[in-house]
């Protein structure tokens, strides 16, 4: 997809993200979620308004590092101060894509803030690892959205193996022969 090599389940996840207003992409560490973010952003195209964010500062910095794209915390993107109950006047009128990484840590308030802000032309993609930490605030966002039937792609294939792990795997396979 636009110069990014994707496996079949990743291509299906990109299609899901680009054809639904709200979608979930779930998978464990190393399954290619960061690669998917780059592919989705490339498909939407340069010059279009996008917001990439994560629930915590550390997660936002990791998102930037893994994708090479600018990212913020959800609170910052929404113009929220974590200790206050108001939204600053942030305009998302032309935003066409919102990507939230580490969505398992989102609170209901964060999700509500995002869904309240997005215009009709916008797609919202929530990525997360169902085995990761849950939000310390209110809600169980990913399980709740799954229960509501929000379209979801599940990534099972691990793409991140270092040489040592691969050598160990080959030794196990050779041993069984």
Model regions: which residues?
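Conserved ATP-binding/catalytic motifs of P-loop helicase motor domains
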Residues: 1-177
């Amino acid at each position: 997809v636009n110069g990014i090599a994707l496996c079949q389940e990743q291509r299906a996840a990109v299609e899901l993200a680009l054809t639904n207003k709200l979608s979930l992409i779930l998978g464990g560490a190393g399954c290619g979620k960061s690669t998917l973010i780059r592919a989705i952003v490339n498909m939407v195209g340069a010059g279009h308004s996008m917001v990439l964010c994560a629930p915590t500062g550390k997660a936002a910095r990791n998102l930037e590092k893994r994708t090479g794209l600018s990212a913020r915390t959800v609170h910052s993107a929404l113009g929220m101060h974590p200790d206050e109950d108001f939204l600053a006047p942030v305009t998302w009128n032309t935003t066409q894509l919102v990507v939230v990484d580490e969505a398992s840590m989102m609170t209901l308030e964060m999700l509500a803030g995002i869904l309240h802000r997005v215009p009709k032309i916008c797609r919202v993609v929530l990525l997360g690892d169902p085995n990761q930490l849950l939000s310390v605030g209110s809600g169980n966002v990913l399980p709740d959205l799954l229960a509501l039937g929000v379209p979801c792609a599940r990534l099972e294939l691990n793409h991140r193996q270092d040489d040592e792990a691969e050598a160990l795997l080959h030794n196990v396979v050779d041993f069984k022969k």
